[in-house]
């Protein structure tokens, strides 16, 4: 009987470990309008390239006026 409770406790501990490592919070993303991008933004890759030169992780086009917004982790 003592061996059975050790097995159950070990299984429970392993399940807790798996669930704890699976629940990782995602970092917040901050964004700022690009200061160097000129014209209308239609290409995410072009926007991202300009944002990289400004020190950001990436960028995307958004809004009715199609502006480039740079993104990074806060």
From Swiss-Prot:
Disulfide bonds join 30-74, 41-61, 47-68, 51-70. PROSITE patterns: GAMMA_THIONIN. Residues 1-27 form the signal peptide. Expressed in flowers and in young fruits. Plant defense peptide with antifungal activity against F.oxysporum and B.cinerea. One of its GO terms (biological process) is defense response to fungus. Monomer. It is found in: Secreted. Belongs to the DEFL family. Keywords: Antimicrobial, Disulfide bond, Fungicide, Plant defense, Secreted, Signal. It comes from Capsicum annuum (Capsicum pepper). Coiled coil: none annotated. InterPro entries: Defensin_plant, Scorpion_toxin-like, Scorpion_toxin-like_sf. This is Defensin J1-2. It holds the Pfam family Gamma-thionin. The keyword Signal applies. GO terms for cellular component: extracellular region.
